[in-house]
Amino acid sequence: MTELRQRVVREDAPPEDKESESEAKLDGETASDSESRAETAPLPTSVDDTPEVLNRALSNLSSRWKNWWVRGILTLAMIAFFFIIIYLGPMVLMMIVMCVQIKCFHEIITIGYNVYHSYDLPWFRTLSWYFLLCVNYFFYGETVTDYFFTLVQREEPLRILSKYHRFISFALYLTGFCMFVLSLVKKHYRLQFYMFGWTHVTLLIVVTQSHLVIHNLFEGMIWFIVPISCVICNDIMAYMFGFFFGRTPLIKLSPKKTWEGFIGGFFATVVFGLLLSYVMSGYRCFVCPVEYNNDTNSFTVDCEPSDLFRLQEYNIPGVIQSAIGWKTVRMYPFQIHSIALSTFASLIGPFGGFFASGFKRAFKIKDFANTIPGHGGIMDRFDCQYLMATFVNVYIASFIRGPNPSKLIQQFLTLRPDQQLHIFNTLKSHLTDKGILTSALEDE
């Protein structure tokens, strides 16, 4: 009887009410049915894509030990590849970061597309990739202008693009925004806005933080290599400690994570960070920022190392002196900063992985993709790296970076002659009042 009354009420409703009710029903179905449809959608699931050679060699092992060896062998292969791209230099590293960014974006967007593909959303994938292009143009254009100012000012096309960079970026984004509005379909309004938000959050997580990775790299390769290596070390050591000694679950989002692995990974990462920092601080190619040399028409990483990368003597606290018998220790100041980096990599960095685990559980998938056997997708390997990159960038800006004289000089040389003369007279007057200029002339 209740159903009959509801049908009568619906039939007696005015046309406008019926239309709004049907819209609400469609929207409600979109919101409520998304989870149920996601269960049947062809999501990227984890499959056994282990190379046939490894499958044969490890066929007699249990699944636990087979996974151990597969992960171990491919981890060593990835580390070897990491060494190769480091050897090739910062510009190749920048290209690799961009490729990783594109692949991570593809993996996340593909999950959304596979979940909602049955709705046949117009222009979803096209607009997602278009917005990726727009955001990359904005961020990398800013980076090139900031770090390679001399090169940009020398080339006429680059100078024009640099001058109007933000306007061009805004125009590109506005075009995509208008395309999205024009693609709206009445029965999919709510879901289309869901996916619009999905794309923009993905851009925020992937592209913005990839941009920060590039910034860290240009400050000196050591600011790129040490943080990434600390995250890799923590991932490996936490897995090893958890594999052999793990008994106590750490977090429900990742049932395989244990307190033993978490704590063991922390101490191992701090020691590793100190040792790696000591080795790298002695090489100019690692500690010098990437700069464009106008004379040689090339990018260089040669400079006079700052105090951060010069050995200094530190007094050891009395309590520790009695234990080890040393009163002082010689180390690089950067090693002290490496403790902060390795601590973040091992204590806070894993929460990037936990966040990714929650995301995957929400969509009932094991991995983002099957790109790397035993490891999942590229995003599965970089979920902690992006959080680490943001921390390093903030750390450099807050505690390390100061005014850059070379950048100031480059900007000074682009001014008009009258502006240069005004700055010269102001600076001369300031130095004379301070007694610096007079003292310098007397010394000569």
Curated annotation (Swiss-Prot):
PROSITE patterns, per the entry: CDS
Protein's pathway: Phospholipid metabolism; CDP-diacylglycerol biosynthesis; CDP-diacylglycerol from sn-glycerol 3-phosphate: step 3/3
Subcellular location per the Swiss-Prot or TrEMBL entry: Endoplasmic reticulum membrane
Major localization class: endoplasmic reticulum
Residues with the Phosphoserine modification: S20, S32, S34, S36
Catalytic activity: a 1,2-diacyl-sn-glycero-3-phosphate + CTP + H(+) = a CDP-1,2-diacyl-sn-glycerol + diphosphate; 1-octadecanoyl-2-(5Z,8Z,11Z,14Z-eicosatetraenoyl)-sn-glycero-3-phosphate + CTP + H(+) = 1-octadecanoyl-2-(5Z,8Z,11Z,14Z-eicosatetraenoyl)-sn-glycero-3-cytidine-5'-diphosphate + diphosphate; 1-octadecanoyl-2-(9Z,12Z-octadecadienoyl)-sn-glycero-3-phosphate + CTP + H(+) = 1-octadecanoyl-2-(9Z,12Z-octadecadienoyl)-sn-glycero-3-cytidine-5'-diphosphate + diphosphate; 1-hexadecanoyl-2-(5Z,8Z,11Z,14Z-eicosatetraenoyl)-sn-glycero-3-phosphate + CTP + H(+) = 1-hexadecanoyl-2-(5Z,8Z,11Z,14Z-eicosatetraenoyl)-sn-glycero-3-cytidine-5'-diphosphate + diphosphate
Entry-linked InterPro entries: PC_trans, PC_Trfase_euk
One cellular component (GO) term of this entry: endoplasmic reticulum membrane
Residue span of region Disordered: 1-48
Membrane topology annotation: Multi-pass membrane protein
Free-text tissue specificity from the UniProt record: Ubiquitous. Expressed in the ganglion cell layer and inner nuclear layer of the retina.
Record-listed E.C. numbers: 2.7.7.41
GO-annotated molecular function: phosphatidate cytidylyltransferase activity
UniProt subunit comment: Homodimer.
Family membership noted in the UniProt record: Belongs to the CDS family.
Stated role: Catalyzes the conversion of phosphatidic acid (PA) to CDP-diacylglycerol (CDP-DAG), an essential intermediate in the synthesis of phosphatidylglycerol, cardiolipin and phosphatidylinositol. Exhibits specificity for the nature of the acyl chains at the sn-1 and sn-2 positions in the substrate, PA and the preferred acyl chain composition is 1-stearoyl-2-arachidonoyl-sn-phosphatidic acid. Plays an important role in regulating the growth and maturation of lipid droplets which are storage organelles at the center of lipid and energy homeostasis.
Protein name, entry field: Phosphatidate cytidylyltransferase 2
Organism: Mus musculus
Gene that encodes the chain: Cds2
